[in-house]
Design a protein with these regions (language model features):
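Glyoxalase I/VOC metalloenzyme domain signal
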Residues: 1-6, 11-33, 43-98, 116-133
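Short, small/polar residue-rich loop motifs at catalytic or cofactor-binding pockets
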Residues: 107-110
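Active-site/ligand-binding-proximal alpha/beta "capping" segment
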Residues: 101-104
Length: 133
């Protein structure tokens, strides 16, 4: 049997703020999860998304330190339409989360925006642009 992609794991230095960010994007994260050192949810399609707080990561990797610099990966959330990209970007930045690239019409045919979650991970918002007439 070949390995099957199953889980995206991320380390966080502020579980409560991180889970609030992803709840705002519609992920079904159980109430009270912010007090746990490990949280995971199953996304539509079966892939799991998990977060470990810094202490949990150091329990099996004592030399771990949070990365610095630009994000090493991004999670991309598809929005219903271009206006939703703008709305979600505004809602999240107004809630105090870091906007990185304001919404723009990308040359590849999508309305696109980039934020950073509380740990600096890239989070993209996108929607197909209407076809030009």
């Amino acid at each position: 049997m070949t390995p099957r992609f199953d889980l995206i794991g991320m380390a966080t230095t502020d579980m409560a703020r991180t889970l609030d960010f992803y709840r705002r994007l519609g992920l079904d994260i159980p109430p009270g999860a912010e007090s746990q050192p490990h949280v995971e949810v199953t996304l539509p399609g079966g892939i799991r998304l998990a977060w470990d707080d810094a202490e949990m990561v150091r329990s099996f990797d004592p030399d771990w330190t949070p990365p610095t610099g630009s994000p090493r990966h991004s999670l991309a959330f598809r929005c219903a339409d271009p206006a939703e990209v703008d709305r979600w970007y505004a809602e999240l930045t107004e809630a105090g989360y870091e906007g990185h690239l304001k919404p723009w019409d990308a040359f590849w045919g999508q309305r696109y925006a980039v934020l950073h979650d509380p740990d600096g991970n890239g989070v993209d918002l996108f929607a197909p642009l209407p076809e030009a007439d």
